[in-house]
């Protein structure tokens, strides 16, 4: 908000006889006795006893636990942080929970960090309310609408905090972060909410008259809405003669019952726009007016008279109508519309129809063209019956036309086609993983292990630190245990050592970025695998892969996959990381490069491989149990 808007908010608050500023409110809060216990503070704030759990919302999807720890740990000792994620995609849901050891630290975090930007988005912090009945209670919760777009969460909080302690405050926004011009404020007490409604409802905020009222739950609103629909009194009239005045408009509807209000929409020049609203005193009068006047011709025009609807309701009805038409259209062309591709450039719509005409009655045939009118090489042919379409597919698929074999199949919508393709790829990958599991998971990737023999340098494919090996005794130590690691040492006279598997043009980058002195290695914390922060880009890795022999390509890709799999912390079996790496190396090289560059894609493939590995282990254990029996 600008300084002028902030001043206007302060002036509005002064009109309400709210003289205390934020500093004065803080000073008033500070009058609480110093020996007040955390338990008493918890009760006064409406949160659970000794609670130190905070809800942090409005987070950027890129914010993780480490980011939040850096922000919240200076306030006090943090016991735990959890960013809530989608169970399938693992993407952040935009909110998290931060737990402190002390209640006072939670209060301080709310006071100092609330509405502060985190990675470009102002966060919203409040006490975590674990009791669902308390969260859903309407006591103390108010609804504000017709807000100025410039009013954000902080401005709303500053405006309404004068009436009592606020538990949560939010301005609703769209997917682009723009205000929807309404919001909610949840007070600790119902009295504070009543005071806010009494003082702010109808008041001007940033030159807009706002409405403030008690919040009504969606369930109650829908119940009330259905009741209002069944007993409507307000009707909408359109296609009215533009020469109609308000007096003539009222005279038209007055015979049906007592009118409480009437409105005829006009433009800037005061001329009628041809529609308006009439509100009757009782439901029966409104129903009678609709029945008598709808579709009646007045001054040469058929007018429409019906129940007045809210914009949201109208949009929902239009959406349903559109969906019904779309489904009807799909049903009409189901099994009769053919997709034809690999067409010669000389084939136009007429020629296409001529080729398919022997198989039945064609309702339409069209070759798709670009802006210049040139054929795109594909088109559509629609028959009248599924039998004709099936016959055309049987006869015309792979037939040579002008030296090119046609592809003919039933036409599909783009979204259905994409969905089927994704399912086919996923099924193929799962089958590959299952086949690997059924065959005993061959092709286990064995990461290199080196013990620093004098004069010997490890053939690490990218110059990184060697990854933990498949030795069961070392792997069984569990997560967070030290792995043996030896860093490559420089050659004679401090010269970099050539790295096995890397073309000469890439040698300098890998040696220069990853050589470390032995002393620096000894100071390195020993807690398992640490990802290399000087990773080469996907483009460089692709160049490396293309320039080495075939038998070395999978080795280099394996050295990229293995640490990424270990870093997930889910491959805890002694041989799990190596087995899963071996399974994932069964993918095409380009697919591996893609999933190394895309965490979501990697997670999907990793979860499939992990599931296959676990199923294999279960079947193996069951087989061993049967043999012992």
Curated annotation (Swiss-Prot):
Residues 20-36 have a biased composition (Low complexity). Its main location: cytoplasm. One of its GO terms (molecular function) is ribonuclease inhibitor activity. Residues 537-618 form the PABC domain. Disulfide bonds: none annotated. GO terms for biological process: mRNA 3'-end processing; mRNA transport; nuclear-transcribed mRNA poly(A) tail shortening; regulation of nuclear-transcribed mRNA poly(A) tail shortening; regulation of translational initiation. Residues 1-48, 503-534 are annotated as: Disordered. Residues 52-130, 140-217, 233-310, 336-413 form the RRM domain. The keyword Cytoplasm applies. One of its GO terms (cellular component) is ribonucleoprotein complex. Residues 1-11, 505-517 have a biased composition (Polar residues). SUPFAM superfamilies: PABC (PABP) domain, RNA-binding domain, RBD. CDD domains: RRM1_I_PABPs, RRM2_I_PABPs, RRM3_I_PABPs, RRM4_I_PABPs. This is Polyadenylate-binding protein, cytoplasmic and nuclear. It comes from Candida albicans (strain SC5314 / ATCC MYA-2876) (Yeast). The gene is PAB1.
């Amino acid at each position: 908000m600008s300084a002028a808007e902030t001043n206007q908010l302060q002036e509005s608050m002064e009109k309400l006889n709210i003289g205390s500023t934020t500093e004065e409110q803080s000073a008033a809060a500070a009058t609480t006795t110093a020996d007040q216990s955390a338990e008493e503070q918890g009760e006064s704030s409406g949160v659970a006893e000794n609670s130190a759990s905070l809800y942090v919302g409005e987070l950027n999807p890129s914010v993780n636990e480490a980011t939040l720890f850096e922000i919240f740990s200076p306030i006090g000792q943090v016991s735990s942080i959890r960013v809530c994620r989608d169970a399938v995609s693992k993407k952040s849901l935009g909110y998290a929970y931060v737990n402190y050891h002390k209640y006072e630290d939670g209060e301080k975090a709310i006071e100092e960090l609330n509405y502060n930007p985190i990675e470009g988005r102002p966060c919203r912090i409040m006490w975590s309310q674990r009791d669902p009945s308390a969260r859903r209670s309407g006591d103390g919760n108010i609804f504000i609408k017709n807000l100025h777009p410039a009013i954000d969460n902080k401005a709303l909080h500053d405006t309404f905090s004068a009436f009592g302690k606020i538990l949560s405050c939010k301005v609703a926004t769209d997917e682009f972060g723009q205000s929807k011009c309404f919001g909610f404020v949840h007070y600790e007490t119902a009295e504070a909410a009543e005071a806010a409604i009494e003082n702010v409802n109808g008041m001007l905020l940033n030159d807009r008259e706002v409405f403030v009222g008690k919040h009504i739950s969606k369930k109650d609103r829908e119940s009330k809405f259905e009741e209002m629909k069944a007993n409507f009194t307000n009707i909408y009239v359109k296609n009215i003669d533009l020469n109609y005045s308000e007096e003539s408009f009222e005279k038209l509807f007055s015979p049906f019952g007592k009118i409480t209000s009437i409105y005829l929409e006009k433009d800037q020049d005061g001329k009628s726009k041809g529609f308006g609203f009439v509100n009757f005193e009782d439901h029966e009068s409104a129903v009678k007016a609709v029945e008598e006047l709808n579709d009646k011709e007045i001054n040469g025009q058929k007018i429409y008279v019906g129940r007045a609807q809210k914009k949201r309701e109208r949009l929902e009805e239009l959406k349903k109508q559109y969906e019904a038409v779309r489904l009807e259209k799909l049903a009409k062309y189901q099994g009769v519309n053919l997709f034809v591709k690999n067409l010669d450039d000389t084939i136009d719509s007429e020629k296409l129809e001529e080729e398919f005409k022997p198989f039945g009655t064609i309702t339409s045939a069209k070759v798709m063209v670009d802006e210049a009118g040139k054929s795109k090489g594909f088109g559509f042919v629609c028959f009248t019956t599924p039998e004709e379409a099936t016959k055309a597919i049987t006869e015309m698929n792979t037939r040579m036309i002008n030296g090119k074999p046609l592809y003919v199949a039933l036409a599909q919508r783009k979204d259905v086609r994409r969905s089927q393709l994704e399912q086919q790829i996923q099924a193929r990958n799962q089958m590959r993983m299952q086949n690997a599991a059924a065959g005993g998971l061959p092709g286990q990737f064995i990461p290199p292990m080196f013990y620093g023999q004098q004069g010997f340098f490890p053939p690490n494919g990218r110059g990184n630190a060697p990854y933990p090996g498949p030795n069961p005794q070392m792997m069984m130590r569990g997560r967070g245990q030290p792995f043996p690691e030896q860093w490559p040492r420089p050659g004679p006279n401090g010269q970099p050592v050539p790295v096995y598997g890397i073309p000469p043009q890439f040698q300098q980058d890998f040696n220069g970025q990853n050589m470390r002195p032995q002393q620096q290695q000894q100071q390195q914390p020993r807690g398992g695998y640490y990802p290399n922060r000087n990773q080469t880009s996907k483009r460089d890795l692709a160049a490396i892969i293309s320039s080495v022999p075939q038998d070395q390509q999978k080795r280099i890709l394996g050295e990229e996959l293995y640490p990424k799999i270990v870093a997930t912390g889910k491959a805890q079996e002694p041989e799990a990381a190596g087995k899963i790496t071996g399974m994932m190396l069964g993918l095409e090289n380009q697919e591996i490069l893609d999933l190394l560059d895309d965490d979501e894609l990697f997670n999907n493939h990793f979860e499939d491989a992990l599931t296959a590995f676990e199923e294999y282990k279960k079947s193996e254990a069951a087989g061993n149990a049967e043999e012992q029996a």
